[in-house]
């Protein structure tokens, strides 16, 4: 049973992780893991064309998870990085960037669940 107790940092990335962890919240399970999430997101330009317009980006998301249960307290840090090219169509670019963020949150969630399973 995983319960998110605190969210700090980037709201969107935290909500994506929280949404992924909801499927692991079952009040019938005996073990309760309380999770505090702190996230930071950094998007930067990797390359530019001759006009100075960014053509390649790198997005880096760092999560700091503090996990508490009746036996122990543990801190887990997960950093995910993804490089991608710019898209001319602004709407398509925003959609693509949101998909990238969702994928990063999915990977980080899976890594967190894997770490929690080892605690049990």
Q: Residues of each region from the PLM?
A:
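A structural "domain/chain start" motif
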Residues: 1-30, 119
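Short, low-complexity, Pro/Ser/Thr/Gly-rich segments in the mature regions of secreted, periplasmic
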Residues: 108-119
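Surface-exposed short loop/turn segments
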Residues: 19, 23-24, 28-77, 81-102, ...
């Amino acid at each position: 049973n995983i319960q998110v107790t605190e969210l700090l940092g980037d709201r969107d990335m935290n909500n994506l992780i929280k949404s992924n962890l909801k499927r692991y919240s079952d009040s019938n399970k005996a073990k309760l893991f309380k999770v505090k999430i702190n996230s930071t997101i950094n998007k930067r330009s990797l390359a530019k064309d001759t006009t100075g317009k960014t053509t390649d980006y790198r997005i880096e998301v760092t999560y700091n998870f503090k996990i508490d249960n009746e036996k122990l307290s543990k801190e887990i840090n997960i950093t995910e990085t993804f490089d991608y090219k710019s898209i001319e169509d602004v709407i398509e670019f925003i959609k693509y960037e949101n998909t990238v963020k969702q994928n990063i949150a999915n990977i980080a969630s899976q890594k967190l669940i894997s770490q929690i399973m080892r605690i049990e």
